[in-house]
């Protein structure tokens, strides 16, 4: 970022938010294809190999020439450019990746400028980056709420909506026209290309740009909550800012555009306890209000998406549920608020009586059916959950096979460490252990029983997590449990993404 700020001071066009000239700066492509910033790499001989920045320099030279973006239909028939195949795809891929870095720069600088002098006020904690930090919040807040909106955020029906949303932040019309050009070409790729190799190229090579645009779209949608937070006297909670995207919240807090119709909206939604969380395209809005108020929220969201983003959202994408009678399918957990009763015996003088104490308890559990479906899709078991061997791994060494299965078990145990009932997790681990044994027995042309007898208990040790072993030493445990491992709930604040098997839909 310091390098970008230095160029910003030297380049007058940048000072006026003109991003188009940055397309011709070589350091942009150096940043775009640096593995430290972007795991996607460019291509060299074909579609699947690396190459040096020499190709980028040749691309820059080509861009300075006339008609560098006028790619006719005849270009698709040419086989080579700079010794590479797929001329058109390679051109647009490199420019798109560089453009993705360019459009991120103004927002990054805006965030940095908004944080100047505020470091002491903003609590900086790496734990806030963990997606598991959401669950302690749910555990603390949702116990006292009545209803929840289960929201599936709609995707824009047309990519032009993303461009129109972005134009309020960028003054450079040339960059917006270039963005439209990328979208048009990507649409043509989708309609023309049918080979498996090219489809894979499409899905991965433009990921950074499309993720940025989608996150920007969601950020614009969530700015409504910032308006409510700033305008309403009922929404003064200091923790409210932590519920939004932390990357964008403080930047939008200062530069938010005031809406004249906000007073009408506030009259419509005056209530003191709305709580909002989101992960990817799914959001939850919980409230202590009545069912009528939640219906107002529901139809407001539908009207808001339709009027502001021109997105038609069907009412069935938003469900109104009562927390006491509903399980939330969120971030790979089935979470519910259930009553937990306990009986206390009290004695006063010679009289004794029983008191029943009822309290709410947040109960996240492991969903067995989706996980078994993911395992079946990955060929670890069949659709009924019966383990099968992973035949594609039989060419690996025994240690590699055991390490792969053990790593999957440890990752799942790590992610579901906060589950209140781990019976389903143990079933998943059993499927993986037996699938590993079947894979090894198939490789050595032996039976599963004979193979397990030969390996003994050391084979099972590979599937225990280090956390289970350590927690068993420092925390109390039930002596009746097998192996003496700790069975309590623990939320780990170092998890930044969902495991592929958990998020496989």
Curated annotation (Swiss-Prot):
Any single Gene Ontology cellular-component annotation: chloroplast
InterPro entries, sorted: Domain_X, Maturase_MatK, Maturase_MatK_N
Pfam families in alphabetical order: Intron_maturas2, MatK_N
UniProt keyword Transmembrane present: no
GO biological process, one term: mRNA processing
GO molecular function, one term: RNA binding
The UniProt record lists the keyword Chaperone: no
Subcellular location: Plastid, Chloroplast
Keywords: Chloroplast, mRNA processing, Plastid, RNA-binding, tRNA processing
Main function: Usually encoded in the trnK tRNA gene intron. Probably assists in splicing its own and other chloroplast group II introns.
Similarity annotation: Belongs to the intron maturase 2 family. MatK subfamily.
Protein name as annotated: Maturase K
Organism encoding this protein: Gomphrena pulchella (Globe amaranth)
High-level lineage: Eukaryota, Viridiplantae, Streptophyta, Embryophyta, Tracheophyta
Protein's gene: matK
């Amino acid at each position: 970022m310091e390098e970008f700020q230095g160029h910003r001071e030297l380049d007058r066009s940048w000072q006026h938010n003109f991003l188009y000239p940055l397309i011709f700066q070589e350091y942009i492509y150096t940043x775009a294809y640096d593995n430290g910033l972007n795991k996607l790499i460019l291509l060299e001989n074909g579609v699947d190999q690396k190459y040096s920045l020499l190709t980028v320099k040749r691309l820059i030279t080509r861009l300075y020439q006339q008609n560098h973006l006028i790619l006719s239909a005849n270009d698709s028939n040419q086989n080579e450019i700079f010794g590479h195949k797929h001329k058109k795809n390679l051109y647009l891929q490199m420019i798109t990746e560089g453009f993705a870095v360019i459009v991120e720069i103004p927002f990054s600088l805006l965030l940095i400028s908004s944080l100047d002098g505020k470091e002491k006020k903003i609590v900086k904690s790496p734990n806030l980056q963990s997606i598991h930090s959401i669950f302690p919040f749910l555990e603390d807040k949702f116990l006292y709420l009545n209803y929840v909106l289960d929201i599936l955020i709609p995707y824009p029906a047309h990519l032009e909506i993303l461009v129109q949303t972005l134009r309020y932040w960028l003054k450079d019309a040339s960059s917006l026209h270039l963005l439209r050009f990328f979208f048009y070409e990507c649409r043509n790729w989708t309609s023309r290309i049918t080979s498996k190799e090219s489809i894979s190229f499409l899905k991965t090579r433009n990921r950074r740009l499309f993720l940025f645009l989608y996150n920007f779209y969601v950020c614009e949608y969530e700015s409504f909550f910032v308006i409510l937070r700033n305008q309403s006297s009922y929404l003064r909670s200091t923790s409210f800012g932590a519920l939004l995207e932390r990357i964008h919240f403080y930047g939008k807090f200062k530069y938010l555009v005031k809406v004249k119709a906000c007073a009408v909206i506030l009259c419509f939604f005056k209530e003191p306890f709305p709580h909002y969380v989101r992960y990817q395209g799914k959001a939850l809005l919980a409230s202590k209000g009545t069912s009528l108020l939640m219906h107002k929220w529901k139809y407001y969201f539908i009207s808001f998406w339709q009027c502001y983003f021109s997105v038609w959202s069907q009412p069935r994408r938003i469900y109104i549920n009562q927390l006491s009678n509903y399980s939330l399918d969120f971030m790979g957990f089935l979470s519910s608020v259930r009553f937990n009763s306990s009986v206390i015996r009290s004695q006063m003088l010679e009289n004794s009586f029983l008191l029943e104490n009822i309290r709410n308890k947040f109960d996240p559990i492991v969903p067995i059916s989706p996980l078994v479906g993911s395992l079946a899709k990955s060929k670890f078991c069949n659709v009924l959950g019966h383990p099968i061997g992973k035949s594609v791994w039989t060419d690996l060494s025994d240690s590699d096979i055991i390490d792969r299965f053990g790593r999957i078990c440890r990752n799942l145990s790590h992610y579901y460490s906060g589950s209140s009932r781990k019976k389903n997790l143990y079933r998943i681990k059993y499927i993986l252990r037996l699938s590993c044994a079947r894979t090894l027995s198939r490789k050595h042309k032996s039976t599963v029983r004979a193979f397990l007898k030969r390996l003994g208990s050391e084979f099972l040790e590979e599937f225990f997590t280090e956390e289970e072993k350590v927690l068993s030493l420092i925390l109390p445990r039930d002596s009746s449990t097998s192996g003496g491992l700790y069975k309590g709930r623990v939320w780990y604040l170092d998890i930044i993404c969902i495991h592929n098997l958990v998020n496989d839909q």
